[in-house]
């Protein structure tokens, strides 16, 4: 979305697709190990692992100062009803780098239908609600872009 809109934030936004969460977190651990020397340059880790249902906001684990900044950013997401930023969040896959001090947050969604599809033969693209999917993408893109484009780093 950022690329399509021609947006270039001040900092790099890295998208990582994880593997093996349910069977040992090998993807998250391997990422941490491969990037251990540069984790101080990781400003924020954002995980989306609850499906792409209607988003409501994010849960954040980090300092209160950073939480206040993210809550201000969250107001940009009010029009699509995904701007509530609460304390406590992250995700299993980003857990290894969070334990090394990287602040983390997870996208919160209305997940009542999650287990209708999760790891079943019904978990196919045709089940996606395009509007909910687009709201998730927009929520993640806005949060990632604004944090990456701030003049100052998100405080730890």
Q: Which positions does each model-derived feature cover?
A:
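Active-site-adjacent substrate-binding region
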Residues: 53-156
């Amino acid at each position: 979305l950022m690329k399509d809109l021609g947006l270039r934030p001040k900092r790099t936004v890295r998208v990582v697709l994880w593997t093996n969460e349910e069977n040992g977190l090998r993807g998250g651990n391997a990422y941490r190990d491969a990037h251990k020397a540069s984790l101080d340059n990781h400003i924020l880790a954002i995980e989306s692992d609850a499906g792409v249902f209607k988003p409501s906001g994010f849960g954040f684990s980090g300092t209160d100062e950073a939480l206040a900044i993210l809550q201000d950013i969250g107001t940009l997401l009010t029009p699509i009803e995904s701007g509530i930023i609460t304390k406590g969040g992250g995700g299993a896959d980003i857990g290894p780098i969070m334990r090394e001090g990287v602040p983390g947050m997870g996208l919160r969604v209305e997940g009542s239908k999650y287990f209708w599809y999760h790891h079943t033969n019904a978990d196919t693209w045709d089940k996606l609600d395009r509007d909910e999917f687009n709201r998730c993408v927009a929520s993640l893109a806005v949060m990632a872009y604004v944090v990456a484009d701030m003049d100052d780093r998100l405080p730890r």
